[in-house]
């Protein structure tokens, strides 16, 4: 019996070729676009965000060319609750979030899977550069890096559950981006040469602080820049304007370069220091998801990424509680930022990950 699949179609070249490859493999496919956010800025020239009206039309065009049914699922409320609210709350509490991880976690691989099941489909498929396999010994599904190291997206997929992995396919996992564009051109897809989306869809101009102030109705109060000893160095514009490791835009004159090293929410102070003050020997993460196992029974040695484009770093990871891991780096790491994801790897296999906690908060978890 022909297996059915819903293809998550963003209107970009990757998801379009994913749809083509699924049809070529013999799946009974339908395309689906999640309507997440309406922002007039997203349609402006120069912005490279997803979820624009033209993206929907591009997806519809490709689906028609492949002879597939095509759906648009409005999910504005779910997106607002699961992604934007969390994004704003994390910034207001001193962190720097990655909303694309939450969009994948709660919408693309959760809400869309629910829709697929309602339509009688066994699988969803996406244009992410990642691979998924089943361990023959344990029966668990594992997540692996895409073979193209320049496009691998496994970092933003670490939160996928066993159920989601069991019902998700990644047709592009063994391809390079160059090969994908070549296939799209061969098939005459309207979006074959379309640039990749890079901006956050609901903040296409990159001005996170203004968006959060407008979205929440809360202004970020100015306060003091201080050094490690508490000496006042100047005035900041509001904490949401700054992230750990930031050097530019501080407006502080000093003999040596200063960086944002921390924030004190209680006193509304932003702490500045030198490069050496950005280094961390360990961090703690919560909201964890482990893929090959349910729990770490003993410390493990692995590689860790604390930012999307960061090279993996050797570390030891141990589980301290049901929802708490401690990561100890072999070498101190620069600008380990609360709110970002720390993702664990063993070779090309994703072991899991979680959200980096502010210093001093782990003991309260």
Model region roles, listed by residue range:
Residues 125-132, 136-365:
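AMP-forming adenylation/ATP pyrophosphatase catalytic core
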Residues 1-158, 169, 179, 185:
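ATP-dependent adenylation/nucleotidyltransferase module used to activate substrates
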């Amino acid at each position: 019996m022909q297996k059915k699949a819903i293809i998550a179609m963003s209107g970009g070249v990757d998801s379009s070729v994913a749809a083509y490859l699924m049809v070529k493999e013999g799946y009974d496919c339908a395309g689906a676009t999640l309507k997440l956010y309406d922002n007039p800025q997203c349609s402006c020239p120069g912005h490279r965000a997803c979820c624009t009206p033209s993206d929907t039309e591009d997806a519809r065009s490709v689906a028609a060319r492949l002879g597939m049914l095509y759906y648009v699922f409005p999910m504005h409320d779910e997106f607002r609750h699961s992604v934007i609210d969390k994004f704003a709350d994390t910034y207001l509490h001193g962190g720097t979030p990655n909303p694309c991880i939450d969009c994948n976690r709660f919408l693309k691989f959760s809400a869309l899977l629910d829709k697929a099941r309602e339509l009688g489909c066994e699988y969803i498929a996406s244009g992410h550069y990642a691979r998924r396999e089943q361990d023959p010994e344990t029966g668990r599904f594992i997540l692996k890096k895409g073979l193209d190291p320049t496009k691998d997206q496994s970092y933003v997929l670490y939160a996928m559950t066993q159920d989601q992995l069991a019902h998700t396919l990644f047709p592009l996992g063994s391809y390079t981006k160059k090969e994908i564009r070549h296939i799209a051109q061969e098939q005459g897809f309207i979006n074959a040469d379309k640039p990749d989306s890079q901006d956050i869809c609901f903040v296409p101009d990159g001005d996170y602080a203004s968006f959060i102030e407008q979205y929440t109705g809360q202004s970020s109060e100015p306060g003091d820049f201080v050094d490690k000893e508490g000496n006042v160095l100047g005035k900041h514009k509001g904490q949401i304007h700054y992230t750990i490791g930031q050097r530019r835009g501080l407006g502080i004159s000093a003999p040596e370069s200063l960086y944002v090293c921390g924030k004190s929410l209680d006193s509304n102070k932003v702490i500045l220091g030198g490069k050496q003050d950005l280094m961390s020997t360990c961090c703690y993460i919560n909201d964890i998801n482990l893929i090959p196992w349910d729990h770490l029974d003993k410390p493990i040695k692995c590689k860790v990424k604390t930012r999307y484009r960061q090279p993996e770093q050797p570390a030891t990871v141990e589980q301290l509680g049901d929802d708490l891991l401690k990561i100890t780096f072999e070498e101190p790491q620069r600008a380990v930022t609360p709110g970002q994801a720390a993702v664990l790897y063993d070779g090309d296999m994703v072991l899991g990950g979680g959200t980096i906690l502010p210093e001093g908060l782990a003991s309260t978890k």
